[in-house]
Amino acid sequence: MKTPGVMIAAVKSGSGKTTVTCAFLKQLLCRKKHPVSFKCGPDYIDPMFHEQVLKIPSKNLDTFFSDVSQIQALYEMELPGHDIAVLEGVMGLYDGLGGIREEGSSYHLARTLDVPIILVVDARGMGKSVIPLIAGFLQYDEKKLIKGVILNRTSKMFFDTIAPLIEEELAIKALGCIPNEKELTISSRHLGLILPEEMEELNFQLEKAGQLLEKYVDVDAMIGIAESALWEKGETVTEEVKLEEKEDLEEKAYSGKVTIFSRAIFRGKNKLYDTKNSGTNIIPPRIAVAKDEAFCFYYRDNLRMLEHYGAELVFFSPLHDEKLPENIHGLLLGGGYPELYAKQLEENESMRKSIKEALEQQLPSLAECGGFMYLHDTLTDREGTTYQMAGVIPAECQYMGKLVRFGYVEVQLPQGLTEKGTAERPEPEKIKAHEFHYFDSTANGEDCIATKPVTGRSWKCIHASDDHFWGFPHLYYPSDPKFVKWFLERTEKHI
């Protein structure tokens, strides 16, 4: 593909890469560019900044969740209609699984996609020591992907002094600096960053960040770095990928090794429900998806994968709607912040009743993290106030005052839930996931086993049966296409 791309990465978390990324995207829009953005890793909130505030399409790319060919397809399928791709890194550039592996790191993603890197360095309180710091990162860069540096939280006077030394000693472009201004600090939440709609001055902050980037950083040189990788390969820059290639990329991204399903309902190109090409009156399953202020954490590719297989998504609000949508065949309750809206969720008694009745009638359902919390009898917030929830799971969910689970896991599915291996030697099916929660349940479930990829530590989790799958892990569907097939096939009995 011939769309320019660049990654904004950092020496460590809290260096300002999100501010720089958003400011850069803002300046691209000012230049009448049509950017698309990506977030390295599993965090939901940075893509929400890009989409909701800057109105730029964004999604996650994660080299733990996906293999090399899948990552490339997931990246390339977003490029049509865009003339530059901006990737925001995660943590420090080389911080991957367990903090010790390259897999899952920003650098691993940049190397997989062969995109250049601009390194953001928090230079606050530093002098010439910033040079050996940068030098160490360059030494680790086997593929020579780091093409420029931005010094954050430092004065222009210092930058003008140190920049010639950086370029002379390290042979790398010093692109500019961003002054240390308090109003540019984006408040933290317990997962990534605060939700965009909850920040009164967010637009002001991003506007100011864009102005500072334009004033103190060579934005044209940043764009040039994105394009330089193409020039070095002798490729020409084009504005968009051919649209006809997109369907093949989706097939590669969402199908994995699953090419033919055993069910007779399979039609067409890997769709379970293809009403266009089947020649029959197949009714696609309608999946109700909770989406509002309380339930907003969804991997874009999870939803698109359901649609890719032919499902129709119907969005609704557990906060504001009175009941579930009509004529649905499945339910998806994603993560978010139900604890911040517990009072409103409790007060919407008709919705709680609607969901409980539907699940008691065995409506196929998936619930993760915040959605899982909502299904409990009660939820107790950090102030100790207890609220009534949907009452589907006879248990309590409460704030623990500390991080309960954090990081990547592989979830081993119950035997027989999906098929894998051979009859003689069945192999457990696994789906990759991520956890990050300060709440815990008195009944986390025992139907699956979650295992940490580096340490091998494992524990039981998830409530799973023939019609539901509920638990704390945030699942990444493309890592196991058969899981999606299993869920959609469960919806058939309700059509």
Residue ranges and their predicted role:
Residues 127-242:
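Internal gly/pro-rich beta-alpha loop/helix module
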